[in-house]
């Protein structure tokens, strides 16, 4: 489970290395370092401002998905101004292209960082979506 930059870490665990989790639950995750689609601050903190295009490519996790990547559910808001929603769609599309179980839930509002906030308008819906998805992948 990961939120925002923590979503990048959780997705890294799913795409890099030989020991992988059984599944990922990713909330508005940072996925890509591609110019114009990335959350700049996350990659400055991770790799510095002097990073190379090769480093950006290596940490753009949509390109690291393989048939061995575990299933994932992605939850985000369409109006997120911090982490562009395209981050989630890139990862979702990569999972689907490899035949991996994936589900994506885009809420019309909420911005960024709503996590488990009680005031998030769609809290009950995301909780139900995650529970239903977990049941489905464990059938």
Question: Which stretches of residues belong to each language-model region?
Answer:
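Loop/turn elements at helix/coil->beta-strand transitions in domains of secreted/extracellular proteins
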Residues: 20-23, 69-72, 98-103
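Residue-level signal for short, function-critical loop segments
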Residues: 30, 78-80, 108
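Short beta-strand/loop motif that positions the catalytic acidic residue
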Residues: 68, 73-76, 80
